[in-house]
């Protein structure tokens, strides 16, 4: 008997259902702004938290009894894990999944065995995708768990570690391409420092820039059509990470001429750790032209670490979706659940409940954001607020028609006395709340 065999397939039954194994709001074929809900959300289930994490923390060992965690032949366990993973994906009805290379294949005892194991499991995943119709949203490489990466991967002081990391990324990128992945994610889990006393910041930054450039070069060499994405995070496991937030990543990409080659995968919990709102990071990514995809989860404001809980805030996600919708929606990206059940949630039902609730929250937030878009009083207010910059005078300033001196001279000659006007924050917050709560059916 499989781990999820006793659980039913999850279907939409509407908001009045009492069935805990049904969607109340996620109706995948429902049209929202003329597009199917499933196509807006592009939901993905992650391999690592769902099938790899054993329920351990720094104070105790794993609490989960998953059949694929049992001792045995490593490749056989990887096959069993894939069987259970695609069973869950199918029962949830989610169209996408995501993985790290070492989530799906054992590393083995050498670099050659790593390559062989990963290729063998890529064949397995290809067959699973063909059998189920489930697609790969993105793949990535785990460059942070093995002790060799204690001092980083691309930023490591040992070039052999850099080379091992390059081998993993090459294989993970090519596997992602073979599996039809829409994106490839680069997360520098240990690309940072714990102390400046042993760190050469300039050298490590240059190493990281060269590594990213090599990935871009290989993407073009192989013809991979997906997007390359960096996932910002300010700290953890290192004290300070070089991909701190969206703005920092943009500065890094610009320094190495990669701003047109790599975009960002934004995680809600990482925004929290960086002292930003999820809304801020998404809006900033669009403003800088590097928005790519989203890791949907939540953190805990009372904890200073990455709790990776399932998202449950319609209010937070409505504003996130508002930015995504008003900028045209996802292209290659989607909503990946980088989220895990709690350590005490040890039953297979808990995994399913976590995803059902999170998917329903996404669905509600999407519809509330669509309501904001349809009656876009926020955009109308912003247009009015910045109207002066659309005047001949404003456009002339931005076009370089004034020097600092000539602009000051003009201001004195016209004897200007500009006055402050209301930002109307309270009214705008009311508009958002009306969209969230008044449109509930």
UniProtKB/Swiss-Prot annotation:
InterPro entries: Xyl_isomerase-like_sf, Xylose_isom_bac, Xylose_isomerase. GO terms for cellular component: cytoplasm. The keyword Cytoplasm applies. The active site is at 100, 103. Mg(2+) 2 binds at residues 267, 270, 306, 308. Keywords: Carbohydrate metabolism, Cytoplasm, Isomerase, Magnesium, Metal-binding, Xylose metabolism. Its EC number is 5.3.1.5. It comes from the Bacteria. GO terms for molecular function: magnesium ion binding; xylose isomerase activity. It is an enzyme of class 5 (isomerase). SUPFAM superfamilies: Xylose isomerase-like. Its main location: cytoplasm. Its cofactor is Mg(2+). Binds 2 magnesium ions per subunit. It catalyses: alpha-D-xylose = alpha-D-xylulofuranose. PROSITE patterns: XYLOSE_ISOMERASE. Disulfide bonds: none annotated. Mg(2+) 1 binds at residues 231, 267, 295, 338. GO terms for biological process: D-xylose metabolic process. It is found in: Cytoplasm. Belongs to the xylose isomerase family. HAMAP family: Xylose_isom_A. Homotetramer. This is Xylose isomerase. It comes from Paraburkholderia phymatum (strain DSM 17167 / CIP 108236 / LMG 21445 / STM815) (Burkholderia phymatum). The gene is xylA.
